[in-house]
Amino acid sequence: MSAVTRCEDGLVLRLYIQPKASRDSIVGLHGDEVKVAITAPPVDGQANSHLTKFLGKQFRVAKSQIVIEKGELGRHKQVKIIHPQQIPPEIAALTE
C-alpha cells in the first residue's frame, strides 16, 4: 500500500508522526509513509488531537471528518480524510 490512497469517500494516508517538533508541517515521504511533524507532546492523546486539528486545517475539513483508523498509540498511523475540500501540494504530489 502506498503512502496516499484514494478511496470512494476521500483519502487514506499512512503517516509517520514526529511529536514535539518545533513547528507543524507535512515534511514529505519517509519510507512508504508521509512524515508529519507536530508540536504537541505524545502524552494523553494530545498528539492525536493536535494531529486531527492540523490535518483538518490542511485539508479544510472538520475534525470529525478525520478518522485515525490504525495506530492510535504509536507513531505509525493510518488516517482517513473524508471528502477533503483541498489537498495540500505535498500530498497532491504523492497521489499522481
From Swiss-Prot:
InterPro entries linked: DUF167 (IPR003746), YggU-like_sf (IPR036591)
A GO term from the CC aspect: cytoplasm
Matching SMART domains: DUF167 (SM01152)
Family that this chain belongs to: Belongs to the UPF0235 family.
Protein name from the UniProt record: UPF0235 protein YggU
Organism, scientific name: Salmonella paratyphi B (strain ATCC BAA-1250 / SPB7)
